[in-house]
Amino acid sequence: MPSISVRRLFDDNQYKLQLAWAAGNSGADNRIGVEADKPVLALVGHLNFIHPNQIQVVGLAESEYLNRLESGETGYQFGNLFDISMSLVIVANGLPVSPGLRDYCHKNDIPLLTSKLESPYLMDVLRIYLQRTLAASSVKHGVFLDVFEIGVLITGHSGLGKSELALELISRGHSLIADDAVELFRIGPETLEGRCSPMLRDFLEVRGLGILNIRHIFGETSIRPKKILQLIINLVEADDEYMKQLDRLSIRTETESILNVNVRSVTLPVAVGRNLAVLVEAAVRNYILQLRGKDSTREFLERHQTQLKENEQNHENRPD
């Protein structure tokens, strides 16, 4: 199961959440990970003795409760608090850290952080961060682009011209997200987010030209850090026989499953004389229309059926 260290959580959110170390630095490598029977949202929560969270947050009410504990009971309560599945304690709202809590965290290698932010906001930010960081992931071969604000993944066998097509689309004002190895993360039940690894970011490999830095060539707006995947365009090599057998009036909606998320897909035959950049733009525009409830093929078939019925009625009403 995916997991991260407390150290990484601290480094990624130190300034945003105003985090500071209070104790337990030796536990910086403690892991925070998704459990099979619990969602990511259950990783963070206010102080809970019954179902301890991996990240226990101490807010105003929790701090007041701990302060009311008698010194003889405190050790017992702390023993219940620091369950083996617990990885981190954060004292929020700028509250002072009690000496007993600090000592316990230090002795048991439990990272103890403080924050000046209110606990509800702190937990909301951490939940969103963990949901993205610990999301199930997969890597797909292809080029991921932002075309008309739609995340489009172009796939196909090597040598079909995916990179050249991407370069053409970028020159027409669209943006590159990732080339070759597209990292996909399931950040929601039906949502996939595509990103690029830091090593490959900004680069596009085009045969004959080598590695191109798209940001330097086309400017800042030619690059996007991430995008929700909404459409897959699969390029297939086609000959005359394939084009003859192609169903021109298909009304079936094709989908491809990635990480158990169904994504709309379109197959584009690659043949001599076809302007693939224009076809991709048309496919994206058509997808946007379908999101609005407009289906050109279905509309044409309905119009065709209506015309046939009118012709049939006119034929029946025609005098012999």
Curated annotation (Swiss-Prot):
Its EC number is 2.7.11.-, 2.7.4.-. Its cofactor is Mg(2+). It comes from the Bacteria. The keyword Nucleotide-binding applies. InterPro entries: HPr(Ser)_kin/Pase, Hpr_kin/Pase_C, Hpr_kin/Pase_Hpr_N, P-loop_NTPase, Ser_kin/Pase_Hpr-like_N_sf. Homohexamer. Belongs to the HPrK/P family. This is HPr kinase/phosphorylase. The gene is hprK.
